[in-house]
Amino acid sequence: MNPEYDYLFKLLLIGDSGVGKSCLLLRFADDTYTESYISTIGVDFKIRTVELDGKVIKLQIWDTAGQERFRTITSSYYRGAHGIIVVYDVTDQESFNNVKQWLNEIDRYASENVNKLLVGNKSDLTSKKVVEYSVAKAFADEIGIPFLETSAKNATNVEQAFMTMAAEIKNRMASQPIPTKAGGPVVRPQEGKPINSKSSSCC
């Protein structure tokens, strides 16, 4: 194993354009927030290493980087993902309605046992909120995935969202036999080597 970490998990952020995926990523990875974040077209990811139950976990978190506006997210984006966070905007009913479509995309392209998390972002905009917590929670419970409301602006529950996902994946990994072949669910340490050389240029 790589001495720097015990696990390397690939996480994806998906959801409608404008729901705050990039802001969530920036808040968690860099603890920064900007009102005027403009996502680039292409692939964007950031790295953050966390500790969980005495294990060091390297999280490689991918953002769609604007591709969702053109419906061009391809199967390659989902390939190899250990966890997928589906984000909607609590002030935008349509973005919540489209969650089902995003979940269908996951079922179509991602691995069968991928972990999922539903996140309602922009919880700080209480006066503009149209998607009630109880409605989203009931939906998440119905399909059996965790749910959190977050605010990238106020940093509310952002840490908890990513740590919840990391814990869910770690628990799933712990209950599975360790794969001996390449391409198994636990990413081999050597696959993580190119990451550091790219991470500084993907803001």
Swiss-Prot record:
Pfam families tied to this protein: Ras (PF00071)
Alphabetized InterPro entries for the sequence: P-loop_NTPase (IPR027417), Rab (IPR050227), Small_GTP-bd (IPR005225), Small_GTPase (IPR001806)
GO MF entries: GTP binding; GTPase activity
Keyword set, alphabetical order: Cell membrane, GTP-binding, Lipoprotein, Membrane, Nucleotide-binding, Prenylation, Protein transport, Transport
Subcellular compartments: Cell membrane
Motif (Effector region): 37-45
GO cellular component: plasma membrane
PROSITE patterns the UniProt entry points to: RAB
Lipid attachment in record (S-geranylgeranyl cysteine): C202, C203
Family annotation (NCBIfam families): small_GTP
Purpose: Protein transport. Probably involved in vesicular traffic.
Protein name: GTP-binding protein YPTC1
Organism per entry: Chlamydomonas reinhardtii
